[in-house]
């Protein structure tokens, strides 16, 4: 299913909690070339207790998303949650449940968004200092908010191999024999936890310690990211509700592509990268090249996520096999199979898609049809095309960027599109 180029060396990495290995690839044709970094002047530092800026710098320079980098981001998350807990404690002991849910969710993940913010900043001449670490950490809180809300909207049972937050609260409601609906209680708790993550993300970003002029440059993209993600989420639920029968394959593809762009690609890669670069004072031409790199790579990243949602190993992805089929997600794979399969098979596929009681046999049949219809190969080709477009845009920006950072971004392009979780 996954074709690894002979020019790519495959390495195993782990996420921040030592689980869920994913494929990391290092381009053998792009050797590391040291380059003296340009630096912005020192920032005053964050308002809260800092983690080790020296450790962050070492972690960044040792590997784009290695164990040291992930450990440093995790330590920053833990420190910030501890600070916020101090504000929750006087309200009521039960309020700590919100922090518990957030902390549990944020123990996992690959820290992609902090990585792209960091390398965007360094690429444009910024420093991997304490202020940048805190800004990068804000991306994780923002993603946690999106995941908490997304699991509610998708009615997901699990996230990263454990019960989704709304399921945990619903079960707690049952165990304590509370009044009312357990499901409504769980949904309300997850929504509030997601809202709180948005608050904490904004606090982490605005108080990160960047100089006022850096924040003035970066803040518009931060605001745009938040607005566009919410619009993308709405497009996703609208796309799931609107009928497809009257649409041809091109119209379906356009709907799916637009959702991918605004729900995933921009906030996963393009916007974190640009926030970091904007803070460092990137010039307009280089910024456009970085934007093109981030958008195309973000689209490829989401397409890989769609493939894993159908073919991924549950022990690695933390999601049940074929979970996207059970949830009825209208992805590029679905567009492809409906266009490529014979009418009878396409009709059966449509009938099964989104069935909560989808059997293992039906899941296998649907996966096989996606493969035999050519949809899987088409998506793999599109992943390669988008990644190549991203790398071409990065090459156009190379002359004005830090060389070491460019090599890291090349490496990240392969890592994000050739992974197993």
Provide a role label for each language-model segment.
Residues 123-128, 203-221, 241-255, 274-290, ...:
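Inter-helical turn/loop segments and adjacent helix faces that build the functional surface
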Residues 118-122, 147, 199-207, 274-278, ...:
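Short glycine/serine- and small hydrophobic-enriched flexible loop segments
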Residues 132-162, 220-232, 266, 270-277, ...:
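Active-site alpha-helical segments that house and flank conserved acidic catalytic motifs
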Residues 2, 9-17, 21-144, 148-149, ...:
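Conserved N-terminal diphosphate/IPP-binding helix and adjacent helical/loop segment
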Residues 160-194, 245-265, 288, 314-340, ...:
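Divalent-cation-assisted or electrostatically stabilized phosphate/pyrophosphate-binding catalytic cores
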Residues 210-230, 235, 247, 283-286, ...:
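Histidine/acidic-rich helix-loop-helix segments that form or flank divalent-metal centers
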Residues 125, 242, 274-285, 308-316, ...:
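C-terminal helix-coil-helix/basic helical segment that borders enzyme active sites and/or dimer interfaces
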Residues 363-421:
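Short hairpin/turn module used for nucleic-acid contact or packing/dimerization
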């Amino acid at each position: 299913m996954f074709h690894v180029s002979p020019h790519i060396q495959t390495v195993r990495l782990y996420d921040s909690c030592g689980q869920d290995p994913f494929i990391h690839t290092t381009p053998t044709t792009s050797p590391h070339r040291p380059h003296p970094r340009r630096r912005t002047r020192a920032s005053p530092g964050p308002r809260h207790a800092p983690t080790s800026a020296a450790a962050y710098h070492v972690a960044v320079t040792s590997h784009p998303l290695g164990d040291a980098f992930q450990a440093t981001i995790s330590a920053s998350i833990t420190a910030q949650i501890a600070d916020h807990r101090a504000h929750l404690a006087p309200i009521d002991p039960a309020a700590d449940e919100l922090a518990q849910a957030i902390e549990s969710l944020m123990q996992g993940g690959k820290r992609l968004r902090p990585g792209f913010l960091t390398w965007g900043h360094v690429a444009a001449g910024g420093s991997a200092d304490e202020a940048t670490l805190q800004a990068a950490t804000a991306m994780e809180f923002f993603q946690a908010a999106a995941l908490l809300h997304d699991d509610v909207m998708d009615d997901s049972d699990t996230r990263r191999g454990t019960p989704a937050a709304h399921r945990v609260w619903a079960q707690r409601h049952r165990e304590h024999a509370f009044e009312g609906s357990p499901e409504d209680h769980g949904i309300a708790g997850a929504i509030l936890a997601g809202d709180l993550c948005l608050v904490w993300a904004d606090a982490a970003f605005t108080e990160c310690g960047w100089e006022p002029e850096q924040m003035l440059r970066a803040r518009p993209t931060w605001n745009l990211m938040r607005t566009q993600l919410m619009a993308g989420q709405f497009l996703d639920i609208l796309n799931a509700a609107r009928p497809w029968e009257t649409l041809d394959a091109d119209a379906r593809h356009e709907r799916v592509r637009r959702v991918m762009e605004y729900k995933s690609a921009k906030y996963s890669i393009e916007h974190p990268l640009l926030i970091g670069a904007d803070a460092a004072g990137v010039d307009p031409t280089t910024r456009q090249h970085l934007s093109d790199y981030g958008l195309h790579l973000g689209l490829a990243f989401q397409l890989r996520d769609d493939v894993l949602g159908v073919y991924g190993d549950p022990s690695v992805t933390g999601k049940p096999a074929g979970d996207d089929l059970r949830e009825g997600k209208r992805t590029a794979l679905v567009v492809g199979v409906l266009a490529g399969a014979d009418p009878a098979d396409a009709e059966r596929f449509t009938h099964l898609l989104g069935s909560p009681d989808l059997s293992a046999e039906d899941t296998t049949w649907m996966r096989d049809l996606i493969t035999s219809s050519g949809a899987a190969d088409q998506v793999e080709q599109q992943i390669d095309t988008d990644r190549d477009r991203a790398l071409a845009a990065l090459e156009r920006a190379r002359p004005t960027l830090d060389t070491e950072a460019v090599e890291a971004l090349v490496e990240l392009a392969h890592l994000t599109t050739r992974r197993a979780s």
